[in-house]
């Protein structure tokens, strides 16, 4: 996706039409990409190169809609500076608005992942969350099998409102707090086991980890400690606005992860981007 002609500002002479410039840029980009693909050992026999002008995320999403793509892959190299922090990179915009799964590939990650981490959340146990967890587990299991590697299934849990219980006049005793934590862990562990039992046909073998901590922190720390090659995670925090996935765990993981991330959309997700 080319950014367009904004960078040329008012430098176009009257005898040069914008379309002429677009044609020149398109031909140059097309040749550069095709030359790169020819020299690549991984180039496919059937491959189509398309050049688009406009905002990268929007044009990518419109191509997904037009050609019914099942997956978008993008490198984890994006913009920097204040603008990127305020408005989000192309990767984050794809996570929020793209209708199909999005794979953000870390430059140093292996092409075929051998250590795959599936981040699930069994609570609340609804049909919607079950379907999303099933998609996560199916995808992660397939990726691990392709590489002949290992599948880790992780659920991070925490006691809601714990900080309110430990400070101020109404704080409870350490003993009571510890018992509440123990009960919370028991419930989360049971719900996670129940989920995996319901989905036995989905995964062949996996290493289960139920870890105390907030979702983003547990996923990132586990992936770094265990040297995961790929994190498979769901984007479930949909706002009242159609297609807007704001503040989700997946988004936070993509922003901070040093590992490739594959973000799975929930069933019924509708992108706010209009097709061409």
Report the location of each language-model feature.
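Structural beta-alpha unit
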Residues: 3, 19-23, 27, 31, ...
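Glycine-rich, Arg-bearing micro-motifs that act as flexible, cationic patches
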Residues: 74-93, 230-255, 270
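General small-molecule cofactor/ligand-binding pocket signal
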Residues: 48-52, 103, 152-154, 193, ...
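Small/aliphatic-rich secondary-structure junction motif
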Residues: 1-17, 115-174, 205, 256, ...
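Short beta-strand elements of ligand-binding domains
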Residues: 73-76, 102-107, 261-265
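Short, structured interface segments
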Residues: 89-110
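A short acidic, glycine-rich active-site loop
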Residues: 17-31, 125, 174-190
């Amino acid at each position: 996706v080319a950014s367009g002609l904004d960078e040329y500002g008012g430098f176009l002479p009257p005898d040069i039409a914008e379309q002429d410039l677009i044609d020149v840029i398109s031909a140059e980009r097309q040749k550069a990409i095709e030359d790169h693909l020819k020299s690549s050992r991984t180039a496919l026999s059937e491959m189509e190169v398309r050049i688009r002008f406009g905002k990268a995320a929007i044009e990518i999403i419109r191509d997904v809609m037009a050609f019914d793509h099942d997956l978008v892959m993008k490198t984890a190299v994006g913009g920097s500076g204040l603008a990127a922090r305020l408005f989000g990179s192309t990767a984050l915009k794809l996570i929020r608005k793209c209708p199909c799964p999005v794979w953000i590939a870390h430059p140093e990650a292996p092409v075929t992942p051998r250590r795959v981490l599936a981040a699930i959340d069994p609570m609340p146990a609804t049909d919607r969350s079950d379907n999303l967890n099933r998609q996560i587990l199916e995808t992660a299991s397939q990726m691990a099998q392709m590489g002949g590697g290992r599948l880790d299934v992780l659920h991070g849990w925490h006691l809601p409102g714990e900080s309110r219980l430990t400070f101020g006049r109404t704080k409870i005793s350490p003993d009571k707090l510890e018992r509440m934590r123990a009960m919370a862990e028991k419930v989360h562990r049971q719900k996670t086991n129940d989920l995996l039992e319901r989905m036995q046909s989905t995964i062949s073998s996996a290493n289960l980890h139920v870890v105390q901590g907030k979702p983003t922190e547990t996923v990132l720390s586990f992936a770094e400690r265990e040297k995961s090659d790929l994190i498979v995670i769901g984007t479930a925090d949909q706002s009242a606005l159609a297609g807007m996935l704001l503040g989700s765990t997946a988004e936070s993981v993509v922003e901070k992860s040093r590992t490739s991330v594959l973000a799975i959309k929930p069933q019924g997700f509708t992108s706010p981007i209009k097709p061409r």
